Amino acid sequence: MTGDLIVRNAYLPSRDAVVDIAVTDGAIAAVGSTAAADAALDGPREIDAGGNLVFPGFVDAHVHFDQALSAAGERVPKHNDEPFDKARNIARTVEYFEGTDAGTLTGNAVECVRMAVANGVLFARAHTYIDRTVGTKVIEAILEARETVSDLFDVEVVAFPQRGLLDGPEVREAARESLELGADLLGGIDPASVNDDLERTIETWFEVATEHDVDIDAHVHDGGTLGTYTLERVAEHAVRNGYEGRVTASHAFALADAAVRSGDPRVRGEPLASVLDALERADVGLTTSYPSTPPGMPIGALRERGITVGHGSDELRDLWVPHGNAAPTEGALVQSLRLDRSYTYSTNPGLAHLWNLLTHGGADLLGIEGYGVEVGTPADLVVMDAPSPQWAVLGQADTEYVIRRGKVVAEEGALVV
């Protein structure tokens, strides 16, 4: 074989071992001893990981590239002088997309993808705005961005109706057209509180999704019993439509409320167990995002049930939240401090669980084939300046190398392509 690359002295958490990794023709040819790697290749470039962490890249399972950097461009963040107000932010979002040209949207998305790749992110699911006024303008801009960065990054595009799929027939037409243009999934948002018709909204999600044979990823922000009822009904519709394993509920704040109620002796039954039963039966996946995850989100219980959970950055310096540096370790650090008061997620097992959300959990949620460091898988590799996932999070470790399909695309936190 003609050799491409050897990564020597790579620590793989999945094996808890330091190995050499041989890469040829964009795929992993050998993992193991120096002799095995040398035998697989002939005259490769060598990278010495020095015993540090190597993994197959972060997965940003929930992000909005479409409004990325909308808070940037001035000395201090724009749209950031008042406390958070959802209604005001929705109005600003509408105004932003109506007034921003497609070229700017594409350029901002590409800039954020390049920033993400430099931080070791190689995969994402991007929720992308549609409504009855802008139609598919934003979708088309993000699809163009996807094409521009395709050599660096894999991204799924979700057609996301911020004001609901029932906000007029034009929205449903925009959703259908978006899927025909190349969007990968249908999005949705709180069926009860946004469009005031829970059942009809969910039915419409599945009607449009099944027409185009695409998966669903819906924002479910509603808390309390309304939120858990929404999740249960989504799960029931998934089973009814044969969509087991094809639906994601993003945010799902109500699960944290259900966990609190389940610990209250005044509450009858087991509210958390009931909704988790429904999600498990329908194989509904979940995403959570560090800017908004409520304390008490029961990600440990989700893991015990085998429910797939990914993590997303959600915002990237945008008009909703000015945070977001496209750096998943930043999100994991925040989560390690806020998820519970006992600092469970600051322990070594807790940090390992958070790391899994950023990597294999997200890969499972997105259905990424060949994700991992095994012979025959695509040579997507990230080398971090940390000896373990735990120290990568706690120390906010630098990214030393990012390798995409066997090609080095970033070194020392900067793109080289």
Go through each PLM region and give its residues.
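His/Asp/Glu-enriched, well-ordered alpha-helical/loop segment
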Residues: 215, 236-247, 299-384
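Active-site gating loops and adjacent loop-to-helix segments of metal-dependent hydrolytic enzymes
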Residues: 69-105, 230-269, 275-278, 282-286, ...
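N-terminal metal-binding scaffold of metallo-dependent hydrolase/deaminase domains
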Residues: 1-41, 389
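Divalent metal-coordination and catalytic microenvironments
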Residues: 10, 26, 51, 62, ...
